[in-house]
A protein has these predicted regions:
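Feature captures outer-membrane beta-barrel proteins of Gram-negative bacteria and organelles
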Residues: 92-99, 136-140, 189-191
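Short glycine-enriched, charge-decorated loop/helix-capping segments at active-site entrances
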Residues: 125-127, 168
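Residue-level preference for beta-strand/loop junctions
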Residues: 37, 89-91, 132, 146, ...
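C-terminal beta-signal and adjacent terminal beta-strands/loops
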Residues: 113-120, 141-195
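Activation segment
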Residues: 14, 65, 161-162
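Gram-negative outer-membrane beta-barrel transporters
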Residues: 2-9, 25-123
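Short, glycine/charged-enriched secondary-structure capping and boundary segments
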Residues: 16, 72, 166-168
Length: 195
């Protein structure tokens, strides 16, 4: 079992934001968040059920905020003070079950990960929010010889739809966003030859 507690204070943390400039044009610019802070707790555990089977469990929690983040040059001026930092869910965890055959020729792994809701933009607008979600992955690897192996896998087995990135646009220009999504469910077989 490993556990850790952390505290970070940032000064002039850089953020890229699309804003309306003083000339009225739309532009992506880099700004410095005056002050921001993050506290976090991590727990990592590994438990051997048998000589061949292990369970891993990891947990993470965080509390983040921009203590001072004002952009007076934007039109209209922007104030993100008090907002949650990007990509910082309050809690997240993953659990995995791994078992190995007696002769070490095959490995079965089942894993599940979960994240609370979080924002992908310092504005914390709804358009940039990712709802809480969980992802399940399964894989089975078979070693036929030292040179040949086969892997059967399923990633995102429950076909969860979740965003990996959001580009938000300035409110005077409609305030919408462009979403980028993770891969859907993937099922496949890989055969590998080592030379």
């Amino acid at each position: 079992v490993n556990a850790a507690y952390s505290e970070y204070d940032y000064t002039d943390q850089q953020q890229q934001i699309i804003v309306v400039t003083q000339s009225g044009s739309l532009a992506g610019k880099t700004f410095n968040a005056g002050e921001s802070e993050m506290t976090g707790f991590e727990l990592e555990t590994k438990y051997a059920i048998t000589d061949n089977t292990q369970i891993d469990f990891n947990y993470y929690s965080s509390d983040t905020s921009f203590k001072s983040f004002v952009i007076p040059t934007a039109r209209p001026p922007l104030n993100f003070t008090g907002n949650q930092m990007n990509y910082s869910p309050e809690s997240a965890y993953n659990i995995a079950f791994t078992t190995v055959s007696d002769d070490d020729s095959s490995i079965l792994r089942v894993a599940y990960s979960y994240k609370d809701e979080y924002f992908m933009d310092p504005s914390n607008r709804y358009i940039s929010m990712q709802d809480s979600y969980g992802v399940a992955n399964v894989s089975y690897t078979k070693y036929f010889t030292d040179d040949w192996k086969m892997k059967i896998f399923c990633t995102n087995c429950t076909d969860e739809i979740y965003k990996t990135q959001v580009t938000t646009f300035a409110i005077p220009y409609g305030g919408g966003g462009r979403n980028y999504y993770a891969n859907a469910r993937r099922i496949g077989v890989e055969i590998t030859k080592t030379f």
